[in-house]
């Protein structure tokens, strides 16, 4: 039985209460696995310097179980050391061990080899999956349990799973109960939470006792409807006696202020402290068309850049955290409501602004300016109307009726349009970028109004506001001058321009061993040990006119008779490839990453989807099957006997209602076939011999195993002119493959070999399909590396690690999202004077060329 008597973390209406202190908490994402160990301490100090109280940190399962049964918690995987550093920095930690984390990380942290187990239920209450999770939790949870807040550590809450309400979990209650029991069994006694990605608190928690709901809000920062949405969830959890915990949201402090006045007591903007995906760790995701590659540079515009540069939002962070510290328990215990009295706003603002009724007296009203222009508003009070100035992209926090006795001061702060960032016996301190108004009163005296000028940076304005015999000392400072609790911090910006690099040496070093193994059919990469890296395939295509490739991903380079033919990244979509009389076929398939989110529009976007060349077929025959489909009644008026039409050819005024087309396909009963619904514009349901599946316009193919296809029904919403051609392809499997696995460890091993070479200069021209190694000299210190060119992929290595990959301008390149696709980071502690590059040319309209390379200093 877990002893709760020593716990010093309490979850109540005021939020996470640490050692009895009731205060709204600001929490920054800071991920050890996206940083070299050498900078952990400095980044933690940077977060502390913004005034944030806490960090949230994922623990990626597959970062620690690097292969089945192979565990690594050393070096930059030493999460225990990171948590200890966070504690030493004075930061609380919300730990998020998954098992699934999303985070735009390879596979959402689920090990890719899980997908090799047939019928395993990922993120389900399924025994095999839970057995693997137990092995992970058996290692991760003791690390967290030993470092809980009540035991001298930093961990104040543990999040189970991540945004489960986005996923089709069959028995959420059973699944989340199993995770809860594992955590509690390892001695976790701080609050357990589960975050909802789209507001479904039961979908996220499973309705399990002992797991508190939290919410991830990602509104458009310019939306007028943030406040009423957030208040709705504040009311929902208040009915359960719980606080509104926002475990992820946008990074803008304007938006954070709007959430604060709408009832949030934990504000954890996602990725205030950006990072970098070192190694083969980015994911593929659905932020593209619909698929996309996540960049190694992991940056959503937070207040710290991936390389540690402090951005302007750090000043806004210090102001907001000073505001929450100043109001303390009164703010944490406040009740949110719709604001009254805000009117005549000259700029776009909230459709329903929020007001906090402070515990012990007073209110805080949020008045947003959702535009880039300065604005004004009027606020009605018991003292009359006050006009306030609104800075661009801001949310004024108007304090009214605040008793000052708790600060050792007389009277009441009746009104303040500047941010209250400090108060004690010496007076009150405010921050503002615009002119502001404060009003004080004491009992029996007429309220005194003071108009305050906007201060310049480094030039605070000082006032003595007097009412009768009572005086208040007031200081108004620019937000840039507001300090964190530990005092002022030196800026961490960078000076120095990018330097063009030369001094390249092309190495006489092989890019693969050439040692292959025989396989009857092309295996998936994971089956031959390539959990990260690439796989080489070769076979004969003598006498074959066309190939059909199903499920290939992520980056596929094809060659016939040693000549580059195609490069594509189609996220597993089926591809037809003409052979054109070739004799041999080669493919290099590189894993960019595994899907971090579950999206069924493309095979490679599904959680648990595997990588490699997929299934490769020769097209033995093709037949047009666009005609002779019967149209069934249902929501249409087609009668019996059913009329014959072409697929999609029914005419009806009942647009949008389902129309079902049915026919028997001319399958031979012994071969594999593929049905191609060419021109499909919307998802449709295809029932093959009674078994239904959804077919997406992004991959309009249906594979038919031998014997399937005697009865095919296609159901789609009726829309005039939305029909298309249909073709049936008869397939024969391509056999007798030679396969060379080249996992990340093999590539990194090659990158570390000594080799002679010849000096070369930029621009470097390559042939399509050609690849080689080059060494490039780099100036000392941390560096941002950039590459110029076209139709070239670059993998950069240093310090025994892959720094990252860049794909220069190329029509075959997919969309990159999540950060800067052209930047790689060489940390200063890893810089020994150079980097090793593996460069590969891709086929396209022109000749591949790496035109140049630059290195800019980073603030290490």
Specify the residue positions occupied by each region the protein language model found:
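Substrate-binding/catalytic cleft of secreted carbohydrate-active enzymes
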Residues: 4, 95, 100-132, 138-267
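Short strand-turn-strand beta-turns centered on an Asx-Gly dipeptide
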Residues: 19, 443, 558-565, 687-693, ...
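Aromatic- and acidic-residue-enriched carbohydrate-binding clefts of CAZyme catalytic domains
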Residues: 21, 58-63, 67-70, 75, ...
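Aromatic-lined substrate-binding rim segments of carbohydrate-active enzymes
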Residues: 40-106, 180, 184
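Carbohydrate-binding surfaces of carbohydrate-active enzymes
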Residues: 133-142, 151-154, 159, 172-173, ...
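Aromatic-lined ligand-binding clefts that engage carbohydrates, nucleic acids, or primary amines
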Residues: 545-560, 585, 665-690, 712-716, ...
